[in-house]
């Protein structure tokens, strides 16, 4: 039997088409993936992300443990509630998972990791904790709802108490705050402003319904994928995995090299990869008809690569992709589509931000 989130019945009420997503029965769409995509870019949409794994790391050595575990450095987090994005690497420098970590105190952090990798991640977190004074606790009692889009914050504000609205007033991107019974974070996976809100399970259905009543469109995994790809955000298992270096996945910015004595997991392998050079993750744009797809072969100056994620972009009106290719790539590449080679433009792997093209 697949897992179901506490919002499962709400999805069915809204006419969702349900699919198996790594063991979870989740909505792929509620009738029109394109309309859901546009709702997030133009007004406000919401996603059930309760399948994501929430983990609290608490203890005297919580900061030391996370500085060992992650390629990014939690010591940079000085303000309460500030968050960062990081890869969690293996000794070979591959990506075990990507995650967000919220800092409350040097003895108290919260991680949000992917659902598809839950058991692997929990095993890895616990194995790496050996020798550290930390307690690692999964928090399945919370549902999580992402409200995203240019009107997302104002619509969510109509559900918040005055104390909750005060708590989030002026909150910058990549922060989280516990406001009464909600944990509200200015994070997301769409390239739009909005919140990711952790709600006690027993309140989640009512909260979802109130968002619906406020005019927030329910959105499925289909729109979530086209939105994140337009925003140039990686999908674990496609754009990177345990065999791929973050340096070859446009995640170099998430590696904190200084101080040199911080010997995080995978550092030695990364240093060797950096010295030798790696492939790079780039964006591809196809302006003629056709759709770029995961797994298609790419030819560039200096060698061959592969499309890691590809789709039709509803915002741009043509196809876009991310591809891992030799670092010698130029401004154009050839993609094999239906047994012929088609020319595409090579760009930075980010296409849309705040509803506007960045090409």
Curated annotation (Swiss-Prot):
Keywords: Aminotransferase, Transferase. It is an enzyme of class 2 (transferase). It catalyses: N(6)-[(R)-S(8)-aminomethyldihydrolipoyl]-L-lysyl-[protein] + (6S)-5,6,7,8-tetrahydrofolate = N(6)-[(R)-dihydrolipoyl]-L-lysyl-[protein] + (6R)-5,10-methylene-5,6,7,8-tetrahydrofolate + NH4(+). GO terms for cellular component: cytosol; glycine cleavage complex. Its EC number is 2.1.2.10. It comes from the Bacteria. HAMAP family: GcvT. Belongs to the GcvT family. This is Aminomethyltransferase. It comes from Pseudoalteromonas atlantica (strain T6c / ATCC BAA-1087).
